[in-house]
Amino acid sequence: MVALHRRLVALLLVLGATITAPILAPLQAAIANDAHVLVLGRISDDPKAHYEQLKPLLDYVVPRMAGVGIREGRILMARDAQQMNSYLRRGRVDWVTETAAMGTQLQHRGSARPLLLTERDGVSRYRTVFFARRDSGIASLADLRGRSIAFQNPFSTSAYYVPASELLDQGLRLEILLSPMDRPASGTVGYLFARSELNISTWVHKRLVDVGVMSNLDWQNPQRVPLAFRKDFIVIRETQEYPRAVEMVRSNLDPKVEARLREVLVEAAGDPDAREALLRFFKTTRFLPIDATAEQALAHLGAGVQRIRAEVE
């Protein structure tokens, strides 16, 4: 019964929702590419939690887009970038909120383009920090040959895509390890996924791996890097800044809808009625135009992601 219940819940989440509440309807009816419907998408491993984060902002946006014919909103989750790419190409999703790395993957496949930067907790850009134990003898990325590094998970921008790309740019070859006890071949950098920032800092502190990576925001958070650990660590490199998150739209979205969506999202930060919806939307504080610096950072990140997919994964 539990398994059946989970399958039913997953099905209802895929079916999406109207602007007021989820509806029970056949799949094709719920995701039809109606001109009056704005569909917000997200690549998700936790659809229920993400639905609750997305819905308030969608509820805020839709009534403000009546002038371009939008009267209804729906949410559609995808399990991975490939499925989301399919949704975008087929017009089943109009707007996607994603990490910078995932956004560049969708853009590379030609199904979406960046709309706005997303500022969360007052931060629109961040960077990746590489760190090691002070007594490790590691002072730079060049010292990582024959050593090991802990990433977070294979979807993380700050704790996988950016640092892995940085290592490749330094001429280092990455080799996945079976466990922290495994050692890389001579001349390569062995890597593992630790699943959380706290695990990363713990593994480095306990010498299970030689180097860890995370965003500068997580590096400064004592819940991710306990103060008892920090005194034993040294930062060996910090990357350039890159966007924290992006809003994407499908490549063939009606220009009038795209323009109005951009306008509504940018103006939301100054509207008291949007405050709670923005907070629920991954603690968003405002949406920002994509300037030349952000474009360059996204292009560099996108090239790195494609190189990782070709040479590492």
Locations of regions flagged by a protein language model:
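Short helices/loops that flank or line small-molecule/ion binding pockets
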Residues: 78-96, 109, 190-217
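Ligand-binding clefts/hinges and TM-proximal coupling segments of bilobed small-molecule sensing domains
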Residues: 151-166, 263-313
